Regions:
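N-terminal subdomain of nucleotide-sugar transferases
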Residues: 1-62, 103-105
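Acceptor-binding helix/loop patch of EC 2.4 sugar-transfer enzymes
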Residues: 9, 70-84, 133-174
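Donor nucleotide-sugar binding/catalytic pocket of nucleotide-sugar-dependent glycosyltransferases
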Residues: 142, 165-221
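Acidic donor-binding loop of glycosyltransferase active sites
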Residues: 184, 287, 299-316, 327-330
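Conserved catalytic-core segment of nucleotide-activated headgroup transferases in glycan assembly
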Residues: 199, 209-303
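Short hydrophobic beta-strand element within catalytic cores of glycosyltransferases
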Residues: 320-323, 330-334
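Conserved acidic donor-binding segment of nucleotide-sugar-dependent glycosyltransferases
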Residues: 349-356, 364-369
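A short, well-ordered alpha-helix in the C-terminal region of glycosyltransferases
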Residues: 371-385, 394-397
Length: 406
């Protein structure tokens, strides 16, 4: 048994969408074998909910997310060699809380969730030199930024975003390389990410794939689906996240008109917290609902005719895909949206990469309930391998190797 300090960019409860979902289930798996202390940021738009977390770990007082103005971000962009991501959660209050925790207790290891918190590595080294550091990379961030740059360069209206990405790629590569090479062990979410990150890491760097997971049973919806959660099409995710914004706008601009032309009564729910300003007008379009934050995504998945995943940029693996498959949804995705999974096109998911092919796949499923059901059943069977209980042995392997002989 080890004593582990877990650092997360937000409180991992409730486990809803993306980072918090992964972090909660990693915490559950760690707590089965180890003693865990949790230090997190707390988001200003949601109440701190630590009761469930306290059953798994000692929860230190969460730290407020730093408030960075557009002007501050612009100054970093223009004057710093550091990537924007490295400054996003840079906080003197968090640094002080971390240093105090390291001085107060003897930790065998600190597990850092995401590259946004990699700025803490030098502080950990100075404060507690014998403590091992595990860096969990939720994405291959340099590759993600390269993909965004390539995508935006092809669209004149997105050239300001392309300029941002161009400035970030080199900085991110340096920062990511340094973080990888100074950690004692690295975790990635997929073999694809592992290969991309190994191009930056020391060749001898221990790097383990621990996939994204969910509590699969939580997605087997037993009750009635409320009418307000029933839609022909559903997309879920954090709606201030650049890959999600891009995917929704692409679907809305190029695919949705084709679907509505063929089936004028089709409905679409965009389910997720903090809709970006670029998305707000979609809520005024006929047939489209922007829900904002919801208590649970499961009713919307259970009530979906088809789950859509129109992503064109990103890295890692999509937790939203695991969630939708675990719920038994019929899924239409881009190839990139399903990246990192050994899926067979037409068996567990339908892949489509052009507006015409995507719209045709969606329409075919909406018109064929039996096919939707069969596709969803195969998807649910596939998702069973991504239950959170399966990551425990993988985490054990990381820590057994890291702490051997201590």
């Amino acid at each position: 048994m080890a004593h582990i300090l877990l650092l997360t960019p937000q409180l991992p409860y409730p486990p809803q969408q993306g980072t918090s979902l992964r972090n909660f289930h990693l915490l559950r798996a760690l707590a089965h074998r180890h003693t865990v202390t949790l230090l997190s940021f707390a988001e200003s738009d949601r109440a701190a909910d630590t009761a469930r977390l306290a059953e798994l770990a000692r929860v230190l007082p969460p730290v407020a997310v730093p408030d960075r103005t557009t002007g501050q971000r612009l100054r970093v962009l223009l004057t710093s060699r550091m990537p924007d991501m490295a400054r996003r959660l840079h906080s003197e209050a968090f640094a002080a809380a971390l240093a105090e925790a390291l001085r107060s207790e003897a930790f065998d290891a600190v597990q850092i969730e995401g590259i946004e918190l990699a700025w803490t590595i030098p502080l950990i080294r100075v404060t507690s030199s014998s403590t091992r550091i595990v860096l969990d990379c939720h994405n291959a961030e340099t590759e993600l930024q390269r993909r965004a740059l390539r995508r935006d360069l092809r669209r004149p209206g997105r050239w300001p975003a392309a300029i941002y990405s161009a400035a970030q790629v080199g900085r991110l590569a340096r920062f990511e390389r340094e973080a990888l090479r100074t950690a004692d062990a690295v975790i990635t979410v997929s073999e694809i990410d592992r290969r991309q990150l190994m191009a930056l890491a020391d060749p001898a760097q221990p790097m383990t794939v621990i996939p994204n997971v969910v509590a699969v049973a939580d997605y087997h919806w037993e009750g009635d689906v409320p009418d307000e959660a029933r839609f022909d099409l559903v997309f879920t995710g954090k709606m201030d996240y650049r890959p999600n914004i891009d995917g929704v706008l692409w679907f809305a601009g190029e695919i949705w008109p084709l679907v509505r032309r063929a089936r004028p009564a089709t409905t679409w729910a965009i389910v997720g917290q903090r809709p970006h300003a670029r998305l707000m007008s979609l809520g005024n379009e006929p047939g489209i609902t922007l829900t904002g934050r919801v208590a649970q995504v499961q009713p919307y998945l259970a009530g979906a005719g088809v789950y859509i995943l129109p992503l064109r940029i990103g890295s890692g693996t999509r937790l939203k895909l695991i969630e939708s498959m675990a719920a038994g949804c019929a899924v239409v995705s881009t190839t990139l949206g399903a990246e990192g999974f050994a899926l067979e096109n037409g068996r567990e998911v339908i892949l489509a990469d052009t507006p015409e092919a995507f719209a045709a796949a969606v329409l075919a499923l909406l018109d064929d309930p039996a096919r939707r059901l069969a596709l969803g059943e195969r998807a649910r069977a596939f998702a069973a391998q991504y239950d959170w209980r399966r990551v425990g042995p993988l985490l054990d392997g990381v820590y057994d190797g890291l702490l051997a002989g201590r």
